[in-house]
Amino acid sequence: MKFAEHLSAHITPEWRKQYTQYEAFKDMLYSAQDQAPSVEVTDEDTVKRYFAKFEEKFFQTCEKELAKINTFYSEKLAEAQRRFATLQNELQSSLDVQKESSGVTTLRQRRKPVFHLSHEERVQHRNIKDLKLAFSEFYLSLILLQNYQNLNFTGFRKILKKHDKILETSRGADWRVIHVEVAPFYTCKKINQLISETEAVVTNELEDGDRQKAMKRLRVPPLGAAQPAPAWTTFRVGLFCGIFIGLNITLGFAAVFKLETDRTVWPLIRIYRGGFLLIEFLFLLGINTYGWRQAGVNHVLIFELNPRNNLSHQHLFEIAGFLGILWCLSLLACFFAPISIIPIYVYPLALYGFMVFFLINPTKTFYYKSRFWLLKLLFRVFTAPFHKVGFADFWLADQLNSLSVILMDLEYMICFYSFELKWDESKGLLPNDPQEPEFCHKYSYGVRAIVQCIPAWLRFIQCLRRYRDTRRAFPHLVNAGKYSTTFFTVTFAALYSTHKEQNHSDTVVFFYLWVFFCIISSCYTLIWDLKMDWGLFDKNAGENTFLREEIVYPQKAYYYCAIIEDVILRFAWTIQISITATTFKPHVGDIIATVFAPLEVFRRFVWNFFRLENEHLDNCGEFRAVRDISVAPLNADDQTLLEQMMDQEDGVRNRQKNRSWKYNQSISLRRPRLASQSKARDTKVLIEDTDDEANT
């Protein structure tokens, strides 16, 4: 692998600009070589002066890069030392509390199930769990910084070696010895000490001296491009997708020959439409994940996932394919119910019952950690006023806004099975009384309108909670206003629908109000999409016209196409209103909803790419590469104490009590190395040391 590719694959995306600009140096060298005057047409002194002038400029650029790297490394190292001191302080506090409450001086307390613990013990258990997670994330940040150190040194060595080869000199090697090999970022070994200290703390204080267990917790995933999925996962993805495509073709033929009347067709469509949208969403989310990884958008950090264990795009494709097969088989079974002994109404219940069980399955199988993460996130979304709102919380609520048809179809299914289904008819999903008009998919009783407003309500209260936490009217109250327009749109749509059915004279008034609020809502959301969520139309965009100063995806055309797509689909309701207002044929609204619901899921899929890109660029601006997890917040006095601590000989002091560590193995930054640390640590990221210039 060429070093440029290796560097690109292994850098920390949020620190991209802080690495040595290896490609720029290469371009300088090749450009100087191409533009050099020929000895055949000019004298040798002119050639020497040309290269001397170039070398002066080249080494000045090297000095600037070296200063940049030294500064960034020093800042990150100081930040790591402060963070380590904070974690030490929090660990000491937890140990002191435990000692006072139970008389146990270490974490080797008797093992009891969490549900048997007292309230104080539960709090302590949570603190220890948070500390383990915090040390794990901190360890990852140390490895990233060590990787930064190694990559930059190798980059300087490679480019200076190339300089000497092209210019046929040894001044590059001399410059490296004089400047790079004595640079603070290379000579400073405190990062290795911090790594050893962290391993010792986690092993001795958090894992009862079990080093194997500690290192398993601290294990850092391979730094670089996404690792290939296991062969069996790839096989299952191909198998499931192939079967799903084949079953869809079969469904198409079966639908032509098996469906008979509208009374049979539309209950099936409404019940199975939501399942299809969910499968489409999972598949497109897999494409999102693949695109983020390829472009270097760190979605793992943005969603605050566990970097050591999370779903890849192949896993999402596998889940979508598997559920897609079940969906097709269930629908096919409904088509062939007349020749089956199982009543038709059993198949939808079995399908969605399995989906629910798959999600809440308590056994540690079938992506248990990812499912548990999703369940916790759903709980936080539906209890938004009572929790601080993070990115993953409002991202998921935004997805629910595009999946509102699923909630409406779920409401329809519950209503249909409860009030309309003719249970003694096993061959078709028929209403109990064919003479009575269907009411479950209408707004007559207001329940459907309420269900349709639930996703917008969740985002609305999330915005209010964020305003409460930050006291910033912009953007949070303004964003809440955006979601409030949905309430008016749905309300007047429901009033128009019910008044139209009853031939009221004021129907046209509600129609115009519906159209008015649709226009307001679409313009509001479109502007917010482009300007706030995507960060486009930046006045400092420079050559990226109508975009922003920095873009991640390689082609500008992606952004322009996304803008056009967002405008079209944000105003797709105009087609729906035009058709429903000018025709009185039954089920026209259902047909349009069935067509436009997948398009809305696709619009959200495109939105996801640029929303996460914008969040990623914010992280890059803050050089935030790992989660910042803390057990106890620091007040101003604590922060001052931690800053002063770095110059004290006795290390960290407890912030509740003015005392030092009293354990045999002090974990002060200045303590002697442990005997167990004399062994070489297998934590460094390997840098390919290829001297073959063809590979550089």
From Swiss-Prot:
Coiled coil: none
Family: Belongs to the SYG1 (TC 2.A.94) family.
Bilayer topology term: Multi-pass membrane protein
GO BP terms in the entry: cellular response to phosphate starvation; intracellular phosphate ion homeostasis; phosphate ion transmembrane transport
Gene name in the database record: Xpr1
Region of interest called Important for inositol polyphosphate binding, as start-end residue ranges on this chain: 158-165
Top-rank taxon, per record: Eukaryota
Complexes and interactors: Homodimer.
Cross-referenced Pfam families: EXS, SPX
Modified residues (Phosphothreonine): 690
Full protein name: Solute carrier family 53 member 1
Species, as recorded: Mus spretus (Western Mediterranean mouse)
